[in-house]
Regions:
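Bacterial N-terminal signal peptides
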Residues: 7-16
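Positively charged n-region of N-terminal signal peptides that target proteins for export
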Residues: 1-6
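Noncatalytic, solvent-exposed loop/strand surfaces
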Residues: 18-244
């Protein structure tokens, strides 16, 4: 059974940071996806007996994702016994806000451990989830309404990832960048509001590599970096052109 556990130090830091809009963690490994956080004054060692438990939540089902935090809300996914994926929303005190079903996830009959994979990406009033079956789901953050659900395998002619798609999609301005892994579509960018395809990586057809893309700068140049099945690649985020 999946459980969220947050310790009092973590909750206090996050709660105070949200008030100054500096402590949100809207995607996997922090705001920039690099594992860096702006909080200061953290304890250098635990007190005797460990940190005090602030709250915990049971009944989330199975999953391998990380929680994300934005605007005073914690979001996390889990899969129930019917192999259905759910997105849960909690306050910073653990109080439930809502949960919503967003479709099937890889269950016990799949080739890998059952459960959700992708960590939710939060962008303002929208949340984006990549399911283990390659479906990009857009959810409204306030009440959990599913706005769109796009089958990326069907759209880009991609094959199912053996162990389930596992990525936290990248939002860049008005684009959602993901890795369908189809012919001429190792990566693709979709309009974050309409779901229409903006670009795909022509000439690059490697399958997805269970990796979350990062946006970096090298001088004045912006690059999207990610791992595919057999290569580390750099993509122009504006055009989808393979740079190296």
């Amino acid at each position: 059974m999946k459980r969220i556990v947050l310790f009092s130090m973590f909750v206090v830091i996050i709660a105070s940071a949200v008030r100054v809009h500096g402590g949100d963690c809207p995607r996997f490994r922090g705001p920039a996806g690099d594992g860096r956080f702006s909080e200061t004054g953290l304890l250098k060692e635990w007190p005797d007996g460990g940190p005090k438990l602030a709250w915990s939540v049971k009944g989330l089902g199975k999953g391998f994702c990380s929680p994300t935090v934005a605007g005073g809300t914690v979001y996390v996914t889990g899969m129930d016994d019917q192999d259905q994926g759910y997105l849960f929303a909690f306050g910073l005190d653990g109080s439930p806000k809502w949960k919503t079903n967003y479709g099937p996830e890889m269950g016990k009959n799949g080739p890998a451990k059952p459960g959700t994979r992708g960590t939710a990406t939060i962008d303002g009033d929208l949340i984006f989830i990549m399911s283990s079956f390659g479906r990009l789901v857009m959810v409204e953050a306030a009440k959990g309404e599913v706005l769109k659900s796009i089958d990326l395998l069907e759209r880009f002619g991609a094959e199912q990832a053996k162990f389930g798609f596992a990525e936290c999609v990248l939002v860049d301005g008005g684009k959602v960048i993901c890795t369908p892994g189809g012919p001429d579509a190792s990566l693709a960018a979709l309009d974050k509001n309409t779901g229409e395809t903006i670009w795909q990586t022509r000439g690059l057809s490697q399958p997805s590599g269970y990796c979350s893309a990062r946006l970096i700068r090298r001088g004045s140049q912006r690059l999207v970096l990610t791992m595919l099945e057999k290569a580390l690649v750099a993509i122009d985020p504006d055009t989808g052109k393979l740079l190296w």
